[in-house]
């Protein structure tokens, strides 16, 4: 391949600009990122070589080398891992293959501090080299390819890069950073070693640097042995030494690992700048033996709701890396969890297909799921914010609390923070994980009609139900305001009955799998006829029956006028101030869920709701004798639709009818 000049993907160009201008406060993370990439490349070679040992060529010992040259102003990170072909260099270094990239770029504000945090949350990997370099040269050869098929990639971090074929005998990749003048302090063995010890000490591969020793300066006067000397300095000996412990952190005893080391390992595997919210480290022995080190992030990634995204758990077998995104190790609703699972029982050549079928993997999955749920239960118990926690469940994860913290204060508010970030995806578990459905239900939190500030669990709600109340009432809506001001809540507010307000897109789908909590049924206030049971007195019931009989002719006329829109029309006792509202049958799909499915491009049935009218409202009383009956009937229906967050099927016709009545 002759030298080519190619353009970066648009998102990469913007990211590079921000990397060079926003991450000034924590420059040294570039070394962590590049060493992590080098380690991953060696892990991938080790995995591919399971089926083809020839890929090791004449260098079976995998390692990462860090070297510097003050005269040339370069810092080089090399590995003898899998390497890259020319096309792979173009694909991997010229584009960002991560999902959510455009979403990421759209959220960048230009505020350096805010963008720095956002970039850290996204993870910049290789591009972090431009924090300290004004040019990067990458030389690589893929394992198994000829020496003549090496590749050189060069970029100054602007809008384009050069790529050409070179002769390269060594397998693997060298990333050569051409340092900026203000980054020359990274040409210091002491500084580089301190950064490696801080961020990459746990890398299981040896990280090598050239050994240095002190050398006195030359005599100013060679004939005077006792005279003065030129300044001495450290000089390279030509030997290489290992500068990291090279011990996988999860294989060490918990007592030998500091919280800071746990945090740095999390940052290395997740490429997150923020510390994790909580973690759990455990070795499981028995019929299936494995070690798990699992983390809860502090912030949700931008692609959290992409169910096809890569999982966050790395799989090792006897400390040999197998795969990055082992989705079989945790259910999809826990896709936000990061960490490592190291199995002693799986074969080294395990495939994704085998993972789906393996009994050992099933046991690991169940164990990891219980461990994560136990961690969440522990956080919920110790959450001292005003939001009460669901209590009464059994924490089957022994020892989690001592992993998290000995002090309740250390966990104060953590569950509330977790739930604000990940609560919506946790609800997916109701439909995916039947075995843990009850545990998940205790972890859910919702807004309430009784308070503007406190999130409420099902257990909290049940503990303060009114005497004679037979159900947990809830409403689903597009927004908190739409839920709180919904006409369907009017009678509940009048009687002081609490209603849970559910506004996550997943809520209605999830509650299809949860019909009751601790023996108490869940009842949507927007489905079926309102039945308050013992909370409705006999006088109210009698008045409702009489109104239904009195209004029979009017209801028949309304039903005829709205036959294309409404399944039925009936008198209701649920309304106090509003003239009408829409509900669906007990087991029908709500209009909100139908709208959501259609917006997502999925097939959804046309829902014909039931129109319920308030017999005491002046507008309803006026209907029967009005010459504008037909227009008023349609306006009544469309206003009820608007009140629940929907839109009239024909907005222009609605406006025309309203205007006609106004003049």
From Swiss-Prot:
Q: Which GO terms describe its cellular component?
A: cytoplasm
One Pfam family named in its UniProt record: HSP90
**Region feature (C):** 596-663
Provide a Gene Ontology MF annotation, just one: ATP hydrolysis activity
Q: Which domain of life is it from?
A: Bacteria
Q: How does it assemble?
A: Homodimer.
Protein name as catalogued? Chaperone protein HtpG
**Recorded name of the encoding gene:** htpG
